[in-house]
């Protein structure tokens, strides 16, 4: 005969998210004591998590949030797409976003030993281990990003494919252009720019592009070569620089043109301060 009630079993499952059989075993081991059973399962979780750490994690989700505390972006990987869409896993990821906003940290190593916002009795790494036990797969917090936010900034977030790709755009100079920032973020996910503007293209990347173009126009007069290089570089900048790209929702205007229009209508100098584009595994 069991030494615990069905109500205790139900509470243990609710508190830990662990399966029925393991909860029964834990309560039997702890003589029906709920608190001890919770601790027992957490210890088991830490032990079983270490056995899963070597497994590949190619699936996952990217999540982001922006509020008065700042902007946080996290990428968390698991083994299968099935678990990537699991409610327990998604709750863990959402909690991580809150943790980054609360602690204002910018590295995974700095985040892991901090107290979890989801369970004050656990560190974030310990909660990761407990969640691994619940979902049965390795969980890896791959990268995090925290951006402070001023009162004169607008932040727009766009998520594609249920968190497979996420973009964040920060506009400086104005606090009420979240819709524009989100439109630009949507454009970024579709167009995938590498740099903000011409000036941010690394010199070595620019030289490589010039060499490629030059090799294609050998034998022509230098004046012709220079004109061709100039034209092709313009196309190159349109391909890789956000501000040079034609807006995906209205190709008649560039992203720079959108920002310039925002400056005119707001009476402030609006600029794209920063953008982020993360894709799972990239």
UniProtKB/Swiss-Prot annotation:
Pfam families: EF_TS. Keywords: Cytoplasm, Elongation factor, Protein biosynthesis. It is found in: Cytoplasm. GO terms for cellular component: cytoplasm. Residues 80-83 are annotated as: Involved in Mg(2+) ion dislocation from EF-Tu. InterPro entries: EF-Ts_dimer_sf (IPR036402), Transl_elong_EFTs/EF1B (IPR001816), Transl_elong_EFTs/EF1B_dimer (IPR014039), Transl_elong_Ts_CS (IPR018101), UBA-like_sf (IPR009060). One of its GO terms (molecular function) is translation elongation factor activity. PANTHER family: ELONGATION FACTOR TS (PTHR11741), ELONGATION FACTOR TS, MITOCHONDRIAL (PTHR11741:SF0). NCBIfam families: tsf. Associates with the EF-Tu.GDP complex and induces the exchange of GDP to GTP. It remains bound to the aminoacyl-tRNA.EF-Tu.GTP complex up to the GTP hydrolysis stage on the ribosome. Belongs to the EF-Ts family. This is Elongation factor Ts. It comes from Chlamydia caviae (strain ATCC VR-813 / DSM 19441 / 03DC25 / GPIC) (Chlamydophila caviae). The gene is tsf.
């Amino acid at each position: 005969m069991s030494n615990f009630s069905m109500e205790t079993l139900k509470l243990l499952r609710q508190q830990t998210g662990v399966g029925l059989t393991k909860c029964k075993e834990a309560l039997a081991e702890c003589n029906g004591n709920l608190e001890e059973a919770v601790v027992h399962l957490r210890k088991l979780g830490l032990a079983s998590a270490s056995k899963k750490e070597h497994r590949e994690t190619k699936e996952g989700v990217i999540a982001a949030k922006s509020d008065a505390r700042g902007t946080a972006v996290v990428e968390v990987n698991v083994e299968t797409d099935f678990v990537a869409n699991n409610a327990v896993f998604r709750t863990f990821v959402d909690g991580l976003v809150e943790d980054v906003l609360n602690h204002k940290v910018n590295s995974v190593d700095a985040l892991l030993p901090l107290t979890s916002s989801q369970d004050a009795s656990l560190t974030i790494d310990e909660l990761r281990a407990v969640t691994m036990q619940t979902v049965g797969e390795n969980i890896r917090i791959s990268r995090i990003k925290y951006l402070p936010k001023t009162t004169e900034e607008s932040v727009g977030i766009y998520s594609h494919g249920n968190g497979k790709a996420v973009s964040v755009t920060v506009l400086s100079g104005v606090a009420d252009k979240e819709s524009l920032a989100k439109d630009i973020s949507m454009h970024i996910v579709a167009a995938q720019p590498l740099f903000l503007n011409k000036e941010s293209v690394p010199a070595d990347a620019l030289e490589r592009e010039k060499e490629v173009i030059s090799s294609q126009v050998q034998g022509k007069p230098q004046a012709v070569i220079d004109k061709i290089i100039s034209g092709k570089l313009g196309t190159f900048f349109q391909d890789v620089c956000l501000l040079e790209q034609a807006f995906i929702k209205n190709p008649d205007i560039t992203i720079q043109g959108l920002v310039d229009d925002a400056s005119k209508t707001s009476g402030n100098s609006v600029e794209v301060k920063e953008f982020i584009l993360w894709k799972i595994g990239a």
